């Protein structure tokens, strides 16, 4: 039987995690990571790489963990996804949609089905972020649609803003916390001992479509 989390029974089984972000282009995946890692925001970021890599070190449950984020900046077709190692080797998956892009909600199913074809999702921890929560007008996705999609795909979700940073840390924390608990075979509880990060960095790599990339 699994036990509850406390500092006495938590061991560092694994001190780094690979997390992949997927979703439509221009929904704010890179902006979310820029805000989370560098506390920076720039509207209309243009990505010329297939993949952007961000790294961040965090302290959770008094231990230090290294996070490596793989930002898929372009839509990957069915022939490409099977050849990219990150989907096999990742620990967590963050789906991203945007309030001003209705197709980003619809295409969530496409990403999900592509991943199911090549990856055992029962071995991954996942969360869904809906960006641009800060918009006062121009939203084309309703809360009812979000609730239904969350239920259909069984995804926890967070409404976030890459501009203000609202709920970004909470959403990413959800994935990381689940990963730590999974590694330690511990039940999730309401513990909130999540401290700020120390070392941050962001890097990008240029990967040709269809080529594989190594993890750590």
Task: Give residue spans per PLM region.
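TRAFAC-class small GTPase G-domain
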Residues: 1-187, 216
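C-terminal-of-GTPase-core extension/linker across diverse P-loop GTPases
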Residues: 178-216
